[in-house]
């Protein structure tokens, strides 16, 4: 992001000619005369015009709105239409920007609209380099995108109403119906999106015992969430509320898009739809049949795994 300039300068008189001011005489129609200063002037410092000043002012306006939590995000395909025109599609432009470590003008809550079948999905920037240098496999420059509203169709967290893992795979999320559902949605993404997204690496909670169903998670391990995923409870709320401490946290951090405001935690059932209850990947502490959710009013809660709720569309693009 640009650092706002503080060295703007006005036109000044050439120092060598400062003592030799020159004026031109102009005869006016009413018989009077006017005198124009024709002394040579030069620019000292950078030549900053309206284009550059307006660009910097956008950064200033963003900083004010972001601090006040009033920023609504911009459609990047409109804001950067001229720049994007040099690429095959907006997502290739994003990928190229990341490869060049150039995120100038990109902000949390800015979005790019896509269609998944007939469904309009507005993909918002949830965080920029939120996990850079993190994880067992070091993460480089990246942007994580989370849809402004949920995908219109609902899904059960797990059809068997069970939040435990298995002997072969102790991670509850890996066996979940919701993960399989998201994997199926990948084919509905535009081809240009599928071409640039990467799997998200995550320190995922484990919950399994051969002696019987567990009510709490007992460990964690690094796993690939897939190319489409949903956030954990900590990534939304910045703390563990219903998930098991500390295993439900992993190495998570709250996404900037969810910080200090309910605004982006509240999602519609489809673009602009009514408030939706939506699934998180975390399973609930103290129960063997509940998973964590974001309630329609933005609060943290938990629902039975066999309930059918909504999910946002989430993906990562790396450098």
Predicted stretch roles:
Residues 1-65:
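Extracellular "spike/adhesin" assembly and maturation modules
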